[in-house]
Amino acid sequence: MAGQTDMELIKDGIRLDGRKPDELREVKITAGVLDNADGSCYLEWGNNKIYAGVFGPMECHPRHKQKADRAIVQARYTMAPFSVNDRKRPGLDRRSSEISYIVSQAFEKVVMVEEFPKASIRVDMQVVEAHAGTRCAAMTAASVALALS
């Protein structure tokens, strides 16, 4: 079958990362960690380490992206080149672009964008250490940062 692997995920009742099958990853959240952001968060979820910052609402640049009746949410999900064992190329790849788009779409539904015409709200997520589940962890960190902004 496609997608199957011979790698053993659980051995002697313990996962590869040392957790029991019914045990969740430990979560640590520290809010307000970035002085220059309107809202920010540092999150550790298992071995994942992620920073998130929210900036705005502010004037939208470039101006051609402005919406006369509402704000736009511009999310950017990036992984540091040193965040994984195999060196990752800096910048946005296809996966990062897709996650950035999904986060933008999700937050436009929960932020009162109609209250801020012609504005922009920027959500930056930086994965500094990745060990599976970074998309969910980054979204959680961004949600905490957004709640503080």
Pin down the residues of each PLM region.
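Short, Gly/Pro- and small/polar-rich lid/capping loops
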Residues: A2-D35, Y42-E44
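Short, conserved phosphate-binding/catalytic loop or strand-edge motifs used
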Residues: A119-M125
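A short glycine/serine-rich beta->alpha loop
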Residues: K88-L92, M125-G133
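Glycine-rich, flexible beta-strand/loop modules in the N-terminal catalytic cores of phosphate-handling
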Residues: A31-V33, D38-K118
